[in-house]
Amino acid sequence: MGQARDRVNYSFKRLKEIPEELRPREKLLKLGPENLSDEELLAVILGSGSKGADVLSLSKELIKMGWEELEKKSVEELLKVRGLGLVKALQVKALVELSKRFKGGKSRISIRNPQEAFEFLKDKFDERRESLIALYLDLSNRLLDWEVVAIGNVNTVFSKPKDILFKAVKLSANGIIIAHNHPQGEPSPSNEDLNFTERLKKACELLGFELLDHLILSEGRYFSFREEGVL
């Protein structure tokens, strides 16, 4: 039998027990974020702990809960975590919400006017055929989601209001912007465009949604029903 060795301890260390150069901030600066554990990354965001718990112990406790559980918890419930005060509970909720918005690749951009809608939409259409796109916005005019609702031939695109409203209900959207392109010709509304917009507006009102605008795009230009006073 060899000489007895000191017991190796894999338990989680408190921040003050870690050499300064290996603490989360210093480690991030020297080695990059990919070399930090989840607890260390959260510790960098939280910045400091409290009298009851240092930042690494606090981060470990939060990570152990899991992201889905943190998403469900209210600020009041988070305050029950030992060492987590109001400011840090709000930081955690803000971080979880930000992560949720970026998840899936569709960041929550804001679309507050026809120009911003045009900038978002201008590269979403197939120039060879007419398509109808719907944007779904929340109360703060942030984009919840968007989809191609219908595809037609060179000159026409057909859809029914229910094709647009089904997803609005699913997303609990507040406002809807629709847009279609004119592959050939001016970005001005036809009688069919006007009639469809009126039908959709009435359907939106019945279900408590707001039809914010209808844009027609063609050759780098756009026509906004809202801007022109048609809607």
From Swiss-Prot:
Matches recorded under Gene3D superfamilies: Cytidine Deaminase, domain 2 (3.40.140.10)
Molecular functions per Gene Ontology: metal ion binding; metallopeptidase activity
UniProt keyword Protease, yes or no: yes
Motif JAMM motif: chain residues: 180-193
Database matches in InterPro entries: MPN, RadC_JAB, UPF0758, UPF0758_CS, UPF0758_N
GO BP: any one term: proteolysis
Binding residue positions for Zn(2+): 180, 182, 193
Spans through the membrane: none
Keywords: Hydrolase, Metal-binding, Metalloprotease, Protease, Zinc
UniProt KW 4Fe-4S keyword: no
Similarity-based family: Belongs to the UPF0758 family.
Protein name: UPF0758 protein aq_1610
Species this chain originates from: Aquifex aeolicus (strain VF5)
Biological classification of the source: Bacteria, Pseudomonadati, Aquificota, Aquificia, Aquificales
